[in-house]
């Protein structure tokens, strides 16, 4: 949880203090990542940090603001503190209630990171930020499709995750 807090503390936006307090007061540190991945206490933290590492690696030198990478990766599943289903809308709702200012690209990326869309027609999250969040999330959950097929292991070891991350970042 310390790393999550340190990343969020770097954000210089209205509502940051309120979101930090929400993170500390909520069950964020205790809940699992999802029904089929990171299924252990603290799994959501590990998943969020994996998504952050993947987005950071993929966006280096590509013009995505580093604060947007932090916002999308760390907050995309914030709504799971309320409910596992429909959490993306709840994530944005929590941020709105905290007075945290999201850019339009960040809001769209978080709201649509679970949409199943054709690779060439990412209509709901048309920015690179939305694409990077969706693919980073899929990489962390073991659902990312590579040219050799879909990764099916739902509990990727850190070593395998890092290998896949390097391969994806180079693509």
Describe the role of every protein-language-model region:
Residues 1-14, 54, 141-142, 152-171:
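Histidine-centered, transition-metal-coordinating active-site segments
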Residues 48, 52-55, 68, 87-121:
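Histidine- and acidic-residue-rich, metal-dependent catalytic cores
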Residues 60, 79, 83, 96-100, ...:
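Hydrophobic/aromatic-lined pockets within catalytic cores
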Residues 84-97, 122, 156-170:
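Divalent-cation-assisted or electrostatically stabilized phosphate/pyrophosphate-binding catalytic cores
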Residues 1-83:
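Acidic/His-rich, divalent-metal-binding segments that scaffold phosphate/diphosphate chemistry
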Residues 44, 67, 84, 88, ...:
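Short capping loops/turns at secondary-structure boundaries
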Residues 101-154:
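Histidine/acidic-rich helix-loop-helix segments that form or flank divalent-metal centers
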């Amino acid at each position: 949880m310390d790393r999550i807090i340190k990343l969020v503390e770097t954000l210089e936006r209205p509502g940051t203090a309120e979101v930090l307090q929400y993170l500390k007061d909520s069950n964020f540190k205790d809940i699992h990542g999802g029904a089929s991945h990171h299924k252990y206490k603290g799994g959501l933290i590990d998943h969020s940090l994996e998504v952050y590492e993947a987005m950071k690696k993929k966006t280096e030198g590509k013009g995505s603001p580093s604060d947007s990478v932090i916002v999308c990766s760390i907050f995309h599943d914030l709504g799971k503190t309320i409910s596992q289903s429909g959490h993306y809308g709840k994530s944005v709702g929590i941020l709105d209630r905290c007075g945290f200012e999201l850019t339009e690209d960040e809001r769209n990326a978080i709201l649509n990171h679970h949409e199943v869309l054709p690779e060439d027609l990412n209509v709901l999250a048309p920015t690179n930020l939305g694409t990077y969040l969706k693919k980073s999330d899929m990489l962390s959950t073991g659902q990312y499709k590579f040219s050799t097929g879909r990764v099916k292991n739902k509990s990727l070891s850190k070593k395998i995750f890092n290998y896949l991350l390097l391969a994806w970042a180079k693509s």
